[in-house]
């Protein structure tokens, strides 16, 4: 798993560029992140009743459901800075979700083929979030502030 990390990072960059081109409404993305959480809940329900699987499953459950919950909060942000900060949390939670999925696969507690769609969805959500943060930061730098006007 660790040897191919450089390749996965390169794949994420390519994926991020593709995903940034796609236009998705706030409501569509809210639904997508919600469904991602639902799919992870279903996956964790099927984990064996071993201690390690249960502990990792709970971690996975927390961070995967936090993706949608925190995106919902970001969509209601009061300022661009607030949006960027909340989207940063979404990014962290999504990345942590992918980490726990990799851990479960490496420990052979879940089948890599069975979780492939879920990992793909997680990577796509992560790419969208990263692209959104970059766009918001770029727009924040170019924004004209009312106090700057003469």
Language-model regions, residue ranges each:
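Short, C-terminally biased terminal segments at protein or domain edges
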Residues: 1-150
């Amino acid at each position: 798993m660790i040897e191919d990390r450089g390749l996965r990072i390169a794949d994420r960059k390519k994926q991020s560029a593709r995903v940034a081109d796609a236009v998705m409404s706030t409501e569509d993305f809210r639904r997508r992140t919600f469904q991602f959480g639902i799919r992870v809940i279903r996956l964790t329900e099927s984990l064996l009743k071993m201690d390690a699987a249960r502990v990792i499953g709970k971690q996975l459950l927390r961070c995967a459901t936090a993706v949608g919950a925190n995106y919902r909060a970001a969509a209601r942000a009061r300022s661009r800075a607030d949006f960027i900060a909340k989207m940063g949390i979404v990014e962290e939670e999504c990345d942590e979700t992918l980490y726990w999925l990799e851990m479960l696969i490496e420990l052979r507690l879940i089948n890599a083929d069975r979780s492939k769609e879920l990992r793909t969805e997680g990577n796509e959500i992560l790419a969208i979030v990263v692209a959104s943060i970059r766009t918001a930061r770029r727009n924040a730098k170019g924004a004209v502030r009312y106090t700057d006007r003469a």
